[in-house]
Curated annotation (Swiss-Prot):
Gene name in the database record: purA
Protein name: Adenylosuccinate synthetase
GO biological process, one term: IMP metabolic process
UniProt-listed SUPFAM superfamilies: P-loop containing nucleoside triphosphate hydrolases
PANTHER family registered for this protein in UniProt: ADENYLOSUCCINATE SYNTHETASE
InterPro entries with a match to the protein in the record: Adenylosuccin_syn_GTP-bd, Adenylosuccin_syn_Lys_AS, Adenylosuccinate_synth_dom1, Adenylosuccinate_synth_dom2, Adenylosuccinate_synth_dom3, Adenylosuccinate_synthetase, P-loop_NTPase
This protein's pathway: Purine metabolism; AMP biosynthesis via de novo pathway; AMP from IMP: step 1/2
GO molecular function, one term: GTP binding
Enzyme Commission numbers on file: 6.3.4.4
A cellular component annotation (GO) from this entry: cytoplasm
Alphabetic keyword roster: Cytoplasm, GTP-binding, Ligase, Magnesium, Metal-binding, Nucleotide-binding, Purine biosynthesis
HAMAP family per the UniProt record, alphabetical: Adenylosucc_synth
Binding site for Mg(2+): 23, 50
Length: 448
């Protein structure tokens, strides 16, 4: 190592995580922060969650590729903690290249990334259909079964594609197991070995130029003084360990997963930005203490909840499913802040609250008459929570596009001030619209 390399100040690493049940608006914020980053890293999840970006009025939905791909010159990394569908990846690459973006030269995929295969999708969909009314709400894209194979030590990884004979042997062994489950237990059709083998090996040459030792590359980039942004998918309350289990996703969505899922030392994570919507949403099944509206539940049809859904355009960017809506839950937010070690919050979609006569904030719960100030663990306990609210005056003025704190309506400032008091960490950013420039900056995560 040269003397000059020793003296380079390492770059800063910022982790962006959702503090709710996903859909907090992480994609826009990652894109905004990428002005100060030379690389963006996905470290968990798969193509089951979409990040929606509005840039210059044009809508782009990214499911697998990091949001930094929208910025020319920014490197994008898919870490070992991700589960990768080659079919979904190349579909997304094609869409981006059609839009005029260079992708393959800037995308780096960990050789240790787990592959999603056709039998994972088949099992995922067959299981969900079999559950009927007890469904979890999976997207049916094979994410969970792929993670099961990873934990069961039978997963096929990206690097396995480059040894055709070994890949074929392991695929045959896996199909023996999974086809038994599909046909004998789930009542589905078997997945064909040869067709699967041909399809997967067909991706090998296309993937190979993008495959690398991502962990080593991130280490070298950081020590060369380059800033890195770690982009989480889903949200803390969907985390496999810390969420409302079993109504959760199949990976760890918390900030600590950035270290394990990208192969970086945890002490290298300098700042954790918690993305928090100014109200709450949830897709699919599971408890939701502050819920106002659920399109599928006749008993949850509060007009304010309907307004939040309509004004906020609360439909899944990947599935198109309507999201359930409710007031911001600060007791759940506190749980997320503690788990993630959040340095500061970014409040998104504040403008959706414009025009309401009053705004409520859930500050705790009652369970059997007892006060509870933190979201309990596990779905059964969360389902027993009765929300305790504080009520604030609403504001009639539009907050859309406001880019300074002082320009916000007084009641909006009062609401946000109380949120950060209850949360115990500062609000460092506020998003007042979907476009990049519709952002209030109070403290910059890369400059704190």
């Amino acid at each position: 190592m040269s003397a000059s390399a020793v003296n380079v100040t390492p770059g800063r690493n910022v982790v962006v995580v959702g503090t709710q049940w996903g859909d907090e608006g992480k994609g826009k914020i990652v894109d905004w922060l990428t002005d100060h980053a030379q690389g963006v890293v996905r470290f968990q999840g798969g193509h089951n969650a979409g990040h929606t970006l509005i840039i210059g009025g044009k809508k782009t939905i990214l499911r697998l590729i990091p949001s930094g791909i929208m910025r020319e010159g920014v490197a994008c990394y898919i870490g070992n903690g991700v589960v990768l569908s080659p079919e979904a990846l190349f579909k997304e690459i094609g869409e981006l290249e059609e839009a005029g973006l260079s992708v393959r030269e800037r995308l780096f995929i960990s050789e240790a990334t787990t592959l999603i295969l056709p039998y994972h999708v088949a099992i995922d969909q067959a299981r969900e259909a079999r559950r009927g009314a007890g469904k979890i709400g999976t997207t049916g894209r094979g994410i969970g079964p792929a993670y099961e194979d990873k934990v069961g030590r039978r997963a096929l990884r990206v690097q396995d594609l480059f040894d055709a004979r070994t890949f074929a042997d392991r695929l045959r062994e896996n199909l023996d197991f999974h086809n038994f489950v599909l046909t004998q237990y789930l009542g589905g059709a078997a997945v064909d070995f040869q067709a699967t083998l041909d399809t997967m090996l067909g991706y090998a040459d296309r993937l190979k130029p993008m495959v690398t030792d991502v962990s080593r590359r991130l280490y070298e980039e950081n020590h060369a003084g380059r800033n890195l942004l770690f982009e989480g998918a889903q949200g803390t309350l969907l985390d496999i360990d810390h969420g409302t289990y079993p109504f959760v996703t199949s990976s760890n969505c918390v900030a600590g997963a950035a270290a394990a899922g990208a192969g970086v030392g945890p002490q290298k994570l300098d700042y954790i930005l918690g993305i928090t919507k100014a109200y709450c949403t949830r897709v699919g099944s599971g408890p939701f203490p502050s819920e106002l509206y659920d399109a599928d539940n006749p008993s949850r049809q509060d007009q304010i909840g309907i307004t939040l859904a309509n004004v906020g355009k609360e439909f899944g960017s990947v599935t198109g499913r309507p999201r359930r809506t409710g007031w911001l839950d600060a007791a759940a937010l506190r749980r997320s802040i503690q788990i993630n070690g959040v340095s500061g919050l970014c409040m998104t979609k504040l403008d959706v609250l414009d025009g309401l006569d009053e705004v409520k904030l859930c500050v705790g719960y009652k369970i059997d008459g007892e006060d509870v100030d933190l979201l309990p663990r596990g779905a059964a306990e969360v389902a027993r929570c009765e929300p305790v609210y504080e009520t604030f005056g609403g504001w009639k003025e539009s907050t859309v596009g406001i880019d300074s704190w002082d320009a916000l309506p007084a009641n909006a400032r009062a609401y946000l001030t109380r949120v950060q008091e209850v949360a115990g960490v500062p609000i460092d950013m506020v998003s007042t619209g979907p476009d990049r420039d519709e952002t209030i900056l109070l403290r910059h995560p890369f400059k704190v």
